[in-house]
């Protein structure tokens, strides 16, 4: 008789298990990828095809957004180290899996409603529309990264601490954090344009 040998679980940063994470928002669950990977680095394999961003690990999407600012452009190892340190801080403060905190933050920071401009007879009229789930995830990750940048750039606060605080506040739905405040602002503008 042969014994079944199970493959060892691949943990993110050799520490965090993604199999125990649940996404509470069913609308974005399809677009938040939680496949296990030791180092979140796909080497650009998913960039050439449309909508394959949904197959990218959500942690790598956050890392890529952190690299978009002027000072961090192309510094992926630095961004990976920032996220790894921020996850440690999140775990120390909340005693939860930081990947689950990230998923809750993405669910709370993504706007559900936005406005588009329609042109009627030469006049631009704002119109409220529902946001697509993939755009909600993209916008949420971008707002989290922008909040981290605004909290830490040219300030004494380390980037990892700013990211940890932003993730915890966004996961709790705190309106004082940048990403949730921007989401509320967009939804308020969309509500007035109905």
Swiss-Prot record:
<dbReference type="GO" id="GO:0019843">
    <property type="term" value="F:rRNA binding"/>
</dbReference>
<dbReference type="InterPro" id="IPR000235">
    <property type="entry name" value="Ribosomal_uS7"/>
</dbReference>
<dbReference type="Pfam" id="PF00177">
    <property type="entry name" value="Ribosomal_S7"/>
</dbReference>
<comment type="function">
    <text>One of the primary rRNA binding proteins, it binds directly to 16S rRNA where it nucleates assembly of the head domain of the 30S subunit. Is located at the subunit interface close to the decoding center.</text>
</comment>
<dbReference type="GO" id="GO:0006412">
    <property type="term" value="P:translation"/>
</dbReference>
<keyword id="KW-0689">Ribosomal protein</keyword>
<keyword id="KW-0694">RNA-binding</keyword>
<comment type="similarity">
    <text>Belongs to the universal ribosomal protein uS7 family.</text>
</comment>
<comment type="subunit">
    <text>Part of the 30S ribosomal subunit.</text>
</comment>
<keyword id="KW-0699">rRNA-binding</keyword>
<dbReference type="GO" id="GO:0015935">
    <property type="term" value="C:small ribosomal subunit"/>
</dbReference>
<dbReference type="InterPro" id="IPR020606">
    <property type="entry name" value="Ribosomal_uS7_CS"/>
</dbReference>
<dbReference type="InterPro" id="IPR036823">
    <property type="entry name" value="Ribosomal_uS7_dom_sf"/>
</dbReference>
<protein>
    <recommendedName>
        <fullName>Small ribosomal subunit protein uS7</fullName>
    </recommendedName>
</protein>
<dbReference type="InterPro" id="IPR026018">
    <property type="entry name" value="Ribosomal_uS7_arc"/>
</dbReference>
<keyword id="KW-0687">Ribonucleoprotein</keyword>
<dbReference type="GO" id="GO:0003735">
    <property type="term" value="F:structural constituent of ribosome"/>
</dbReference>
<dbReference type="InterPro" id="IPR023798">
    <property type="entry name" value="Ribosomal_uS7_dom"/>
</dbReference>
<dbReference type="InterPro" id="IPR005716">
    <property type="entry name" value="Ribosomal_uS7_euk/arc"/>
</dbReference>
């Amino acid at each position: 008789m042969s014994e079944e040998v199970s493959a060892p679980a691949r943990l993110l940063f050799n520490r965090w298990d993604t199999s125990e994470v649940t996404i509470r928002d069913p609308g974005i669950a399809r677009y938040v990828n939680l496949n296990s990977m030791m180092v979140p680095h796909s080497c650009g394999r998913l960039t050439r095809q449309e909508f394959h961003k949904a197959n990218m690990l959500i942690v790598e999407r956050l890392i890529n957004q952190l690299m978009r600012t002027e000072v961090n452009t192309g510094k992926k190892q630095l961004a990976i180290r920032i996220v790894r340190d921020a996850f440690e801080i999140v775990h120390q403060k909340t005693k939860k899996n930081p990947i689950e905190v990230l998923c809750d933050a993405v669910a709370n920071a993504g706007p559900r409603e936005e406005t588009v401009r329609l042109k009627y007879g030469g006049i631009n009229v704002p119109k409220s529309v529902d946001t697509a789930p993939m755009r909600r995830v993209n916008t949420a990750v971008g707002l989290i990264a922008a909040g981290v940048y605004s909290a830490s750039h040219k300030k004494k606060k380390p980037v990892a601490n700013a990211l940890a605080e932003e993730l915890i506040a966004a996961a709790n739905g705190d309106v004082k954090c940048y990403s949730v405040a921007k989401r509320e602002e967009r939804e308020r503008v969309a509500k007035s344009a109905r």
